[in-house]
Amino acid sequence: MSGDVPQGSLCTTNTVSDLIEQLQYGLGEGPCVDAYLLDWPVLEPDLASPKSSRWPAFSPQAIDAGVRAVFGFPLQIGSVRLGALNLYRDQPGPLTDDQHADALVLADLVGQSVLLLQADAPPGALAAELETGADLHYTLHQASGMVSVQLGVSVAEALIRLRAYAFANERPLVDVAESVVARTLRFCAAGDEG
């Protein structure tokens, strides 16, 4: 993540966590997005609760994936925002005080680890140990640039259009991006043939 725009996941632990990260990145909403932007833990103990309406696109898809509770914790060292740690479970319920304290310690340790790994990287480059997860999103950045040119809009607007297309067509964002890069999907301005 950088600035005010989530940049994607660097690490997931299983297929469900990978799906949750793809949903957040693709939809632009979810616990990690909010934890990063708000710089505060975001705790949702029951995604299926009628009181849980903060993520109208993310929540139903996360529930379909078997996730019932999600918890996002910012990764920040001093004033440096690094990203967010996402925890989930398949049963609803809040974190206990001990679990919450452990998650805060874990987020701090992950943040320190990222800084240590990044310390030896050349300026402007990502540490080799962190590159694996970043590779998954290069295609999306390339597709955003292509759509930006196709529509004559900013890259940020192009990413919004890609996300909207993926959501409307019930396709993973990465699949849509791969189609754009492969030139099997082209975005056209209103009134253009494409």
Which residues fall in each region the model found?
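Short hydrophobic alpha-helical segments used for membrane anchoring or interfacial signaling
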Residues: 1-5
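Regulatory sensory and allosteric helical modules in signal-transduction proteins
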Residues: 9-10, 17-54, 60-68
